């Protein structure tokens, strides 16, 4: 009996990390100041190594997706959906500044430990879309501040996913062109894009999820990630073996958005495809200087939240998605 116990223990200790780290998914619930409860699912993503980027032979491949390189990703949680208007409105209402940004003098909110929230949006923040559609039109800075608010609201540390985490999760253990294989004709089952979206966003989680239970990774809205954009950013990792994931580069001027949107072509929905903030994204903002919070006419930019798996994890539900 003792021998059996020892053998089982040795197997566990020497098993691949991703087999030992099947942390459980959980439901997060946020309660607004008026008592409304809003819940969302956080999927546990096991650690692993994957090939990031695309080969030159891949249709639609761009120079900034090369060279391909191996990246080691630590286990983390990722929201199964894009952040919804419903949840983003709670953040906006609890933290929004009452003094305009143009003065350079923003008022802190007392609601959530004095987080400086966004200035009032020019126009309608929802752009006329219902609550369950993805929130959109926020800058990277605004998305980051939302994560700070959510962390204080829940007591758990939320953040944006790194670019490598995002691609790893989108691929869901595969190496195909799209999250659903290599056939672009299959995208209509998984994504809202130019072929089926009718030029607008749609309620989250209405299409099929990928094999890790994540909805709308391609399409609907582009998603901000943590990283700054560098067109040569992959070059430094080539030929080194698997590099440990970290946001790259350490600094810069513009950030990366992944996944394509409701108006994107199939090529823009490839798992390796990258987009980055451009000056014209701010053209709809009449303020001078331009707001650091809003992209008023960019209804195609959103985000989803991530969390590192660590000792403060509050796990309330068994993992629902299995690696296939």
Task: Show which residues each predicted segment covers.
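Hydrophobic membrane-insertion alpha-helices, especially the h-region
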Residues: 1-9
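N-terminal pre-domain segments of enzymes
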Residues: 15-35, 315
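Mature N-terminal segment immediately following signal peptide/propeptide cleavage
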Residues: 37-52
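Short loop/turn microsegments at loop-to-beta-strand junctions
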Residues: 40, 156-157, 209-212
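Active-site microenvironments of metalloenzymes and redox enzymes
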Residues: 52-59, 72-181, 226-234, 307-324
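Surface-exposed recognition segments
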Residues: 58-71, 174-175, 197-200, 218-324
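Short, surface-exposed glycine/acidic/tryptophan-bearing loops
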Residues: 184-187
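Short, well-ordered junction/capping motifs at the entry into regular secondary structure
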Residues: 189-218, 246-247
